[in-house]
A protein has these predicted regions:
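Active-site-proximal alpha-helix that buttresses catalytic centers in soluble enzyme cores
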Residues: 12-294
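Short, low-complexity intrinsically disordered segments enriched in A/P/G/S/L with frequent Arg
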Residues: 2-6
């Protein structure tokens, strides 16, 4: 594990002002993949937005599965405090076990070195403020595509679509929690979770919706394979047509599309919503407050 360079007495670093991050480096950590370089686009997007705010001394992007790799990014940093925020959709295997272990974190979410402290924050996707991100995505896709008219939320059934997997229940729990929070606001005629690999399935949205209008929001970080190809096909678009649109650089779902007697709007992934920058910042604030209170 590389040893960071820093300044000052590390014993006093944790006591700095919880909302003053002018001494700190933020590292936004994405999963990344060698199969799709665009998977890191949301990380770049939100890093750029946070740099403009000038809250941190420095904002760096990093990935686990592609360059710039998080270990190399951390090795080059020199700051009293380093906050690592996983740009992950849930508290799953990678964000909760693999990455903390490989970066040397034990049960405590902070590592102290001479002159610096690393903070490992909670993933963005499990934060309660993701409710606002989902609602922003749902409202925007209808507003941007009002044909033949923009229905009111009370005339829409909202679906939050996730992957779902029997290997880790947290993936499903994060979506179910958000559905409960949105449902409690009584904005939409109905709010449901649907999944690619668990029940209720993506295609079940047509039977579950009591309204003609449906909005589907994919609960994914990037507009990658699942969000751009798999879910449109599961919603009923021919696979050939989806691939042709993708190859031509066109949206793989036309908003709205009539399917099974319903009018369906399909939004971009939640991870590309600009409000995600606020979620990242809130995760940093929480980590700073938690350490200061220990």
């Amino acid at each position: 594990m590389p040893r960071l360079r820093g300044s000052g007495n590390s014993a006093n670093l944790a006591g700095m002002s919880g909302d003053n991050f002018s001494d700190a480096v933020l590292v936004v950590l994405g999963h990344g993949t060698t199969l799709n370089a665009e998977s890191a686009r949301p990380v770049r997007q939100h890093c750029a937005a946070l740099r403009q705010r000038k809250v941190f001394f420095c904002v760096s992007q990093a990935c686990w599965k592609q360059e710039p790799h998080v270990r190399r990014v951390l090795a080059k940093l020199a700051a009293p405090r380093v906050f690592i925020v996983p740009m992950f959709i849930s508290e799953g295997y990678f964000s909760s076990e693999i990455i903390p272990r490989e970066l040397g974190f034990g049960e405590h979410p902070a590592r102290e070195f001479p002159g610096t402290i690393w903070y490992y924050c909670q993933p963005v996707g499990s934060h309660d403020s993701m409710t606002g991100v989902i609602l922003a995505r749902a409202a925007a896709v209808v507003r941007q595509h009002p044909f033949p008219y923009a229905p009111k939320p009370a005339d829409i059934t909202l679906f939050v679509a996730g992957h779902g997997t029997g290997r880790n229940a947290n993936s499903r729990k994060a979506i179910e929690h958000q559905v409960e929070l949105i449902r409690a606001q009584n904005l939409y005629a109905g709010v449901h979770d649907i999944f690619m690999e668990e029940s209720p399935r993506i295609a079940d949205c047509y039977a579950l919706a009591a309204t003609k209008n449906i909005v589907v929001v994919p609960f994914f970080i990037s507009d990658g394979l699942h969000a751009v190809e798999d879910i449109p096909v599961l919603l009923g678009e021919p696979e050939r047509l989806v691939k042709e649109r993708l190859a031509a650089g066109q949206p793989t779902w036309r908003n709205p599309t009539e399917k099974n007697g319903k009018r369906v709007w399909y939004s971009p992934a939640v991870g590309t919503e600009p409000l995600m920058a606020d979620v990242i910042l809130e995760r940093v604030r929480e980590a700073a407050r938690k350490i200061n209170n220990i």
